[in-house]
Each structure stands twice: as structure tokens, then as C-alpha cells.
């Protein structure tokens, strides 16, 4: 059963009961997933940016947007408009497919994995996790990468509090650390 179907049929009614909500539309849901990668070396090395864009496109299955510097910062040797990273925003079916792959395939492949931190919520029910290596995703072959790079994954929800967001992600199968 796909994650989207499981959310509609089992997770949504269970959360409505657990959070004692009167309307099904009050139940928190995932709005979007943003995958972001900041590349300090992209200012000097254009190949690293190209490789990074290709990797993110493989992982997410969607076109990648190159992020550019808003201001020049001499200390970092960047000028305004220079490419300094890349990002992808996933919504709808692609978002659910990515979350399913992240939870069931990628996260368990992290070395010494004991669960993700339950403290990485932002106060409004959104969750951010950092991944140190891109090779945890099955789409990336270890032989074809030039360097190990990480990424930030932000899961934006309609939850009104961290507790609601945590309940939603726990029901979806997110492996949180137990103290």
C-alpha cells in the first residue's frame, strides 16, 4: 500500500481520534518536502554544482533549481548572483513516493542509525533533518559520485504544534530515537 493511500485510509482517521479533532480536515498532513543542498565549493568549482544537480534530480525525480547568492560576501569569496546551492520542492504523489523511500530505504542504510532526533521540529510542526551522505539513497551509485555531500530535508506540515507534527510523522513510520 502506498504511503498516500495509507495516510488517507488508516493514518488520517487514527490521528483524528488520537488528537481528538472534530473535523477530518483539521488532521495534520504533509504539504511539501524541500530537499536543499548548500555548496560552498560551487563558487570555485562548477563541476561540483553540476554533479550535485544531477544527484538531486536522480534522488527526487524532479528538476532542480540552482540557488544563487543574494548578496556579495567577500569573506566567502562569493559575488551576488553566483550559484551557491540547489534545491527541489516536492508536492503531491512525488512527495509521498520520496517520503516512502526516505523512511523505508534511505534512513535504515545510514551507518550506526539509531533513529532521527525528535527535537528537530521548528515550533510549528515542521521537521528538518540533515543527511550527511547522498549514498544512502538507492538511486545513487557509489562508483559514480565524485565526493560525498549531504543535504537538508525539510518536511512542511499543516500541524499547529510540534506534538501534532511528531504524531503525524510517527504514524507515517518516521523512526524517531527513543530516549
UniProtKB/Swiss-Prot annotation:
What one GO molecular function would you report for this record? structural constituent of ribosome
* The organism's place on the tree of life at top rank: Bacteria
Its BP terms in the Gene Ontology are: translation
Q: Does the keyword Ribonucleoprotein apply?
A: yes
What InterPro entries does the record point to?
A: Ribosomal_uL5 (IPR002132), Ribosomal_uL5_bac-type (IPR020930), Ribosomal_uL5_C (IPR031309), Ribosomal_uL5_CS (IPR020929), Ribosomal_uL5_dom_sf (IPR022803), Ribosomal_uL5_N (IPR031310)
- State the protein's purpose: This is one of the proteins that bind and probably mediate the attachment of the 5S RNA into the large ribosomal subunit, where it forms part of the central protuberance. In the 70S ribosome it contacts protein S13 of the 30S subunit (bridge B1b), connecting the 2 subunits; this bridge is implicated in subunit movement. Contacts the P site tRNA; the 5S rRNA and some of its associated proteins might help stabilize positioning of ribosome-bound tRNAs.
* NCBIfam families per the UniProt record, alphabetical: PRK00010.1 (NF000585)
Report the family membership.
Belongs to the universal ribosomal protein uL5 family.
Q: What is this protein called?
A: Large ribosomal subunit protein uL5
Q: Which organism is it from?
A: Synechococcus sp. (strain CC9605)
What taxonomic classification does the UniProt entry list for its organism? Answer: Bacteria, Bacillati, Cyanobacteriota, Cyanophyceae, Synechococcales
Amino acid at each position: 500500500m502506498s504511503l498516500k493511500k495509507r495516510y488517507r485510509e488508516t493514518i488520517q482517521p487514527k490521528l483524528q481520534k488520537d488528537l481528538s479533532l472534530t473535523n477530518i480536515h483539521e488532521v495534520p498532513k504533509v504539504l511539501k518536502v524541500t530537499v536543499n543542498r548548500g555548496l560552498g565549493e560551487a563558487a570555485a568549482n562548477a563541476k561540483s554544482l553540476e554533479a550535485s544537480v544531477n544527484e538531486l534530480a536522480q534522488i527526487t525525480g524532479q528538476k532542480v533549481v540552482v540557488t544563487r547568492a543574494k548578496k556579495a560576501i567577500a569573506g566567502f569569496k562569493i559575488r551576488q548572483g553566483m550559484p551557491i546551492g540547489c534545491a527541489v520542492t516536492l508536492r503531491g504523489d512525488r512527495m509521498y513516493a520520496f517520503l516512502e523511500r526516505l523512511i523505508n530505504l534511505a534512513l535504515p542504510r545510514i551507518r550506526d542509525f539509531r533513529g532521527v532526533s525528535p527535537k528537530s521540529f521548528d515550533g510549528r510542526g515542521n521537521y528538518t533533518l540533515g543527511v550527511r551522505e547522498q549514498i544512502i539513497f538507492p538511486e545513487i551509485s557509489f562508483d559514480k559520485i565524485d565526493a560525498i555531500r549531504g543535504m537538508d530535508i525539510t518536511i512542511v506540515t499543516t500541524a499547529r504544534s510540534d506534538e501534532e507534527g511528531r504524531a503525524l510523522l510517527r504514524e507515517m513510520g518516521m523512526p524517531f530515537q527513543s530516549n
